[in-house]
């Protein structure tokens, strides 16, 4: 079967020019119909809307975490927040529909407060999670709760104050700034996805965009070149080497994996080097 060595980039930002983070995957891909279909699925962003797909484990879970990290890096910065919302016994919903109404009301109050303070509308990704008890398997119940990744000009106190019903707090609300240093995006994605058997419902507001996927490059690397890089740690983790390959970008992390069928693959995480002396960013 004929193969090519593909470079696929995931540029995380509103535009290619202002993006400050990107991931690069370098790997072997077949040119047959089945390989093309698999490649199309791999490069299709996960929407993170509605319920999780039925099969959300193994490879699918790994792929979901990667896309969630990219979605966060594309839309949020250290100025944005992660808010956890829980329920007291009095307000604990009995159905998913009620929990959905509660989070919609929370977002509506945020929009109202932003409008009153002449702030842009909030942008958010929300995750509602719960689990029913199952005596046969020993599975314990998990109460309804929500996670909200939020871009909003309101103070943290104002954000937390929106979690109420008829002016009465519905439970505990805790709002913290996002930490976007090394490994923190993965940690947050793992935290929100660590229980794949629980029921999840995702929501994203208008304004949340997917990462930018430039056209893949099938001529930049050779199979022998990928193997040489992957098997030599001095090259794999050499920032100067990758800076020449991707001008304007600085290596954060490099990983190499070997597959018995496809051979070596490389995954890079990179930050944009700050602009200097008025020179435009390279992309």
Predicted regions and their residues:
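Right-hand nucleic-acid polymerase module
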Residues: 1-142, 152-283
């Amino acid at each position: 079967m004929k193969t090519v060595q593909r470079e696929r980039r995931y540029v995380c930002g509103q535009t290619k020019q202002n993006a400050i983070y990107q991931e690069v995957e370098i790997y072997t891909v077949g040119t047959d119909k089945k390989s093309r279909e698999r490649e199309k699925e791999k490069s299709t962003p996960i929407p993170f809307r509605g319920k999780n797909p039925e099969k959300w484990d193994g490879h699918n879970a790994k792929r979901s975490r990667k896309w969630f990290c990219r979605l966060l890096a594309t839309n949020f910065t250290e100025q944005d927040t992660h808010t956890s919302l829980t329920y007291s016994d009095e307000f604990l919903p009995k159905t998913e529909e009620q929990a959905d109404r509660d989070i919609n009301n929370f977002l509506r109050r945020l929009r109202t407060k932003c409008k009153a303070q002449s702030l842009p509308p909030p942008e958010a990704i929300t995750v509602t999670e719960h689990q029913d008890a199952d005596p046969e398997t020993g599975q314990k119940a998990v109460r309804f709760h929500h996670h909200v990744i939020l871009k909003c000009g309101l103070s943290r106190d104002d954000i937390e104050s929106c979690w109420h019903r008829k002016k009465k707090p519905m439970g505990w609300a805790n709002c913290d700034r996002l930490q976007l240093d090394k490994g923190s995006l993965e940690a947050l994605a793992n935290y929100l996805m660590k229980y794949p058997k629980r029921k999840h419902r995702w929501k994203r507001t208008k304004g949340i965009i997917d990462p930018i996927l430039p056209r893949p490059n099938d001529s930049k690397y050779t199979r022998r070149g990928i193997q040489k890089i992957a098997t030599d740690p001095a090259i794999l983790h050499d920032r100067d080497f990758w800076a020449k390959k991707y001008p304007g970008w600085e290596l954060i992390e490099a990983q190499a994996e070997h597959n018995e069928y496809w051979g070596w693959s490389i995954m890079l995480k990179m930050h944009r080097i700050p602009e200097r002396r008025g020179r435009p960013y390279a992309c």
